[in-house]
Amino acid sequence: MQPALNAFTEQPADTAEATSRAGLEQAFALFNQMSSQLSESYSLLEERVTELKGQLALVSAQRMEELAEKERLANRLQSLLDLLPGGVIVIDAHGVVREANPAALGLLGEPLVGMLWREVIARCFAPREDDGHEISLRDGRRLSIATRSLNGEPGQLILLNDLTDTRRLQEQLARHERLSALGRMVASLAHQIRTPLSAALLYAGHLSEQALPTDQQQRFAGRLKERLHELEHQVRDMLVFARGELPLTDRVAPKALFDSLRAAAEVHVQGLQVRWQCEARGGELLCNRDTLVGTVLNLVENAIQACGPELRLKVHLYARADSLRLSVSDNGPGMDPATLARLGEPFFTTKTTGTGLGLAVVKAVARAHQGQLQLRSRPGRGTCATLILPLIPAAPLSAIQE
């Protein structure tokens, strides 16, 4: 009985051992499987890390190249600003100068960076009556000033351009041109002045006669006055053309200028068909009022002489942007392109009498007002002469301070 009992007892132990071994084998197989998966995942992770490192290195290299290119561009722009002949100033939202190139420092002096712009204006600028669209410094130089907003941030960019040398060269050139024509002018004027002067002397001689009736005295006195006015007109034209400069001391509203012109022209256009039209109301004109009115009267007289009694004349004053335009148009015979091209040259005239200085004087007066004269004409269609003059802002410096 004992051997049989032992056999029965050993059988369950073998079964338990086999079960335990199978569990271990299964666990070991599962461990191997998990290890293999982890190894594969680690390999994939290493590959991904390597790939990301490569991408990061590429992006970093590109970024560094972009930064280097931006730095080179910034250096080029800085060099360009340093070499610009014009001044460049950057002011922030509080009106403080943050940057200024060497040209700006040369124009306005130091200190500049860190100063309030309004303090710089008070220290450096000395506006004059004849500045127009330019502004004078205390040392006499003339600047043009332009402002631009800073895109994307508060503040302003101020551009300064020194026009002193340009204006001086323009004045010298105009002076040389006038001097080169002076000889011809003297000869022409001597001939033109002789006739009214001789007539004036003749009428003065008649007036000295004691027994002359009163009505004849008045007639001779009137003719003497006409000849003297003619002489005065020719001398005035000569002086304006020779000097080429005018003191611009009058600030006149366009409507006031129009009224002055209409009053002065009343005697000249009496009995003629004239249309007066004024469409400019705002702004001011920096000018020499008397000379400017006399210049426009020259244009009116030219139209009257060209058209005769059948004259239909229009005097039109209007504004375009920042300029004032005063046009005198007629229904006369007009001119061909060749004649129109020469019109305004000193001593060129299509009349049998006259010095040929009329339109040359008009051009000189327009230039003295920083404006220009435009002429349009067609044969059989009349002529239109237009003076274009700059309108002056009421307070050019206050806008910059703001």
From Swiss-Prot:
Q: Which PROSITE patterns match?
A: HIS_KIN, PAS
- CDD domains found in the cross-reference section: HATPase, HisKA, PAS
For biological process, the GO terms are: phosphorelay signal transduction system
Q: Where is the PTM Phosphohistidine found along the chain? A: 191
Q: EC no.?
A: 2.7.13.3
Explain what the UniProt record notes about the effect of disrupting the gene for this protein. Answer: Mutant shows severe swimming defect.
A GO term for molecular function? phosphorelay sensor kinase activity
Q: Which Pfam families match?
A: HATPase_c (PF02518), HisKA (PF00512), PAS_8 (PF13188)
Q: Report keywords, A-Z.
A: ATP-binding, Kinase, Nucleotide-binding, Phosphoprotein, Transferase, Two-component regulatory system
* Catalysed conversion reaction: ATP + protein L-histidine = ADP + protein N-phospho-L-histidine
Q: What InterPro entries does the annotation carry?
A: HATPase_C_sf, His_kinase_dom, HisK_dim/P_dom, HisK_dim/P_sf, PAS, PAS-like_dom_sf, Sig_transdc_His_kin-like_C
**Protein's job:** Member of the two-component regulatory system FleS/FleR that regulates the expression of multiple genes involved in flagellar synthesis, adhesion, swarming, motility and antibiotic resistance. May function as a membrane-associated protein kinase that phosphorylates FleR in response to environmental signals leading to activation of specific gene promoters.
This chain belongs to the protein called Sensor protein kinase FleS
Native species: Pseudomonas aeruginosa (strain ATCC 15692 / DSM 22644 / CIP 104116 / JCM 14847 / LMG 12228 / 1C / PRS 101 / PAO1)
